[in-house]
Amino acid sequence: MNCVYYKSSEKMQEIPDGSVDLIITSPPYFNVKDYSKDGYQVERHSSVDKADLGSYSTYEEYISALLVVWKECERVLAPNGKLCINVPLMPMIKRSYCTHYNRDIFDIQSSIQQSILKNTKLFLLDLYIWNRTNSSKKLMFGSYPYPRNFYAQNTTEFITVYVKDGRPKNTPKDIKEASSLTQEEWLLFTKQIWDIPIPNKNDLAFGKHSAIMPEEIPYRCIKLFSCIDDIVLDPFTGSGTTLKVAKSLGRNYIGYELYENYRQVIDEKLNSVKRGELLDKK
């Protein structure tokens, strides 16, 4: 507990059955991001790990490989535990189809949802839409400026919440009170559209990791779905954002990260906060 394992999360034998209260993660993108390179996707810091789920040759293999992790998440989740998965729509260039269009949309959220609901006993609890309020200036032009084949700008992502069946554990009254949300937080966090900017240069991982999760996403999920001293897991730790926020909210954390090159930035993030320092934010 309160550690990071630098290995694949396909087998999380370090974690006992039914011991994790909340899982928050964003899985590797399919054939879009190279996690063996820096945040600018220029300098390579290591070879591509053979267990990198984002490097599979077909989309079907990618979704199947992710399911192995989701089944492990189901195993380690406590009764009434939540699994929060953040993914975007993924525009892909068509290279192998003889069509008039040169791109296709991979609806990763839908594919993962179907895979989980068909192959596990988890239930779909909620779906939030992350509206990236300061999206990239890299525009998708399509047939611009002429009609018929405009491409929508990719400015949203999804946070899908699954729940494991069962009664929640008994939580002492003082812990429940200390973990409570303000009325303002409750009203804001339960809206299905979350207006949150993407991370900028103020994030310690900027330029070091190519897919940084904004701290506000795990902050809201942790406040909504866990109490102080609960265990929060991220099976695709990346730059360590989820773990940092969990620590600052007085939760325990466990992370799995395939690329050890990210150890330094993960340690920097974890060392930049004190346990429970955000509990006085409300």
Feature map (PLM): residue ranges:
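Core catalytic lobe of class I
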Residues: 1-265
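Short, conserved SAM-binding/catalytic segment
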Residues: 248, 267-281
